[in-house]
UniProtKB/Swiss-Prot annotation:
One of its GO terms (cellular component) is cytosolic large ribosomal subunit. This is Large ribosomal subunit protein uL18. Belongs to the universal ribosomal protein uL18 family. GO terms for biological process: translation. Keywords: Ribonucleoprotein, Ribosomal protein, RNA-binding, rRNA-binding. This is one of the proteins that bind and probably mediate the attachment of the 5S RNA into the large ribosomal subunit, where it forms part of the central protuberance. The lineage of its organism: Bacteria, Bacillati, Chloroflexota, Chloroflexia, Chloroflexales. CDD domains: Ribosomal_L18_L5e (cd00432).
Amino acid sequence: MGKRTPRELRLRRHNRIRKRVSGTPERPRLNVFRSHAHIYAQVIDDTVGHTLVAASTIEKGWSGSPELTKTQEAALVGKLIAERALQAGITKVVFDRGGYKYHGRVKALAEAAREAGLNF
């Protein structure tokens, strides 16, 4: 048995988290995915498997500028996902960090979403 890759380790952590974290219609799950270049956030109702709201740095018309760091872009995505969720009538969510450490871009997204009005 060889050494596991960082991706495999993250997916194992994510599976452990997903055993306990589930989104409901009253309190959907705020999921975060982080790639090397971009960050994605979705608010998901796991009972029906639907994405209710989404935001990312890859969307058309993204207002990010070249001088922003990836952490600052993540904070903008957090603010954007919170605004869209509040427009959709969602105020409470369960945060799913996706197996990533609660640090850096993931933390910036979560804190910006909290400041913009999401409760978790």
